[in-house]
Amino acid sequence: MLSNDIDGNYKYYYADKDGHLQFGWVTHNNETYYISPPWGAENRTYLKNINEKTYLFGPKGRLLRNTATDISWDDFCVSDENGVVKTGVIRLEDNRLYYFNPEIYMTTPLSGEWAEFDGKLYHFEMPISVSPYSKGSPITTNTTLEKDGKTYIIDENGVATEKKD
């Protein structure tokens, strides 16, 4: 049974059939929850670091798997099938590529900006809305662009490679 507001601070707890509070990972009605000891779970979308992995949780501590969502104003992230927050270059449902930095949030460079991540060069387009509250700059794909007098071929993964004559 998932109970709310036991301590008056809008936190959520899980009690087993005997009424004992459960903490840590809890499965209830085929959903996975994480109840932080001793504070309980929050009634909002949030991130939590557990054993050196960052997980995405929804209201009441429900683990959000394969989810792309806002976690606050202008903070947008994506989780994998285990609820772990993804970083690096990720293709969203709009079929565009975006870069999520190691601090989790979507990177939004200025339109036309170049950036190097993990030894690879990328070019970013004008920021667009990816959700009601967040904007992201898609990574340019499948084109050729000029930078500092050099020609770069950008592949389907957004990686720019200098064109050799």
PLM features: residue spans?
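Extracellular adhesion/carbohydrate-binding repeat motifs centered on closely spaced tryptophans
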Residues: 1-165
